[in-house]
């Protein structure tokens, strides 16, 4: 790699890190210091902003609510997408291409299109302000994406493996769990990553379909806006803590994501 390319990468890397550093910097400042002027590091280091989040029930429950419905959504999306993707990759039937395209069109539509139908449906059947409501709503977008990614990985697995397993006496569930899934574990890791991240950062549906009991952290962060202004320090601390789950997920699936870029539909 030439010096020029390294310099460009360094500048790009710094460009990405500056907002994160500034957010972290603000989280250790008081609101007065933040509004007082620019500084590269806190003049009066304080943990009060984080103390507010960890002691205020509405704040830490927002994180727990988000983690709960995001994990639930990822689990449901993978459970539905795995057999569906296997069917699309292994079998040919009338209208399979049209069905696959129709499935993907759900992912292309913006969440606002489905907002009112979801709100009216969940309100009428008693699912409003529940974790499962948000998880199921996000499945409308994550399942098509998961099927698309997994179908690409499954298509790269030779069909002869299926036939050999059946000849050896494997039932389909046993073959699928013990043989096939380990072969596409990279695809599952990539799919879980994208499902998790979409559900974690999505705000419109999560905020509209919840009120109190299942309110996510993204919606809780908006309540820092009040008549007295914005509590920038607490908002910055909440932002830092919101980044951490995504960083942990990326760390655990980093190898699978790299393989996904090389082999799958990523």
Residue positions per predicted region:
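A structural signal for multi-pass alpha-helical bundles of membrane permease subunits
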Residues: 5-266
């Amino acid at each position: 790699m030439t010096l020029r390319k390294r310099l460009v990468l360094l500048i790009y890397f710094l460009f990405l890190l500056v907002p994160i550093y500034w957010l972290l910097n603000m989280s250790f400042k008081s609101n007065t210091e933040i509004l007082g002027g620019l500084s590269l590091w806190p003049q009066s280091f304080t943990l009060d902003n984080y103390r507010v989040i960890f002691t205020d029930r509405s704040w830490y429950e927002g994180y727990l609510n988000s983690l709960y419905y995001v994990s639930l959504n990822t689990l449901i999306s993978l459970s539905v997408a795995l057999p569906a993707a296997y069917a699309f990759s292994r079998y040919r039937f009338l209208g399979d291409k049209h069905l696959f395209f129709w499935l993907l069109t759900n992912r292309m539509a913006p969440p606002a299109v489905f907002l009112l139908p979801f709100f009216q449906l969940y309100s009428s059947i008693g699912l409003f302000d529940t974790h499962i409501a948000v998880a199921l709503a996000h499945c409308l977008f994550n399942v098509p994406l998961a099927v698309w990614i997994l179908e690409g990985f499954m298509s790269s697995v030779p069909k002869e493996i299926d036939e050999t397993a059946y000849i050896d006496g494997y039932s389909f569930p046993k073959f699928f769990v013990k043989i096939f899934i380990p072969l596409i574990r990279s695809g599952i890791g990539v799919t879980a990553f994208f499902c998790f991240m979409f559900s974690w950062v999505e705000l419109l549906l999560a905020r509209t379909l919840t009120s109190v009991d299942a309110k996510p952290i993204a919606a809780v962060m908006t309540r820092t806006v009040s008549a007295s202004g914005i509590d920038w320090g607490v908002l910055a601390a909440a932002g830092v803590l919101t980044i951490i789950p995504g960083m942990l997920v990326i760390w655990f699936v980093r190898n699978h994501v790299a393989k996904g870029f090389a082999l799958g539909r990523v």
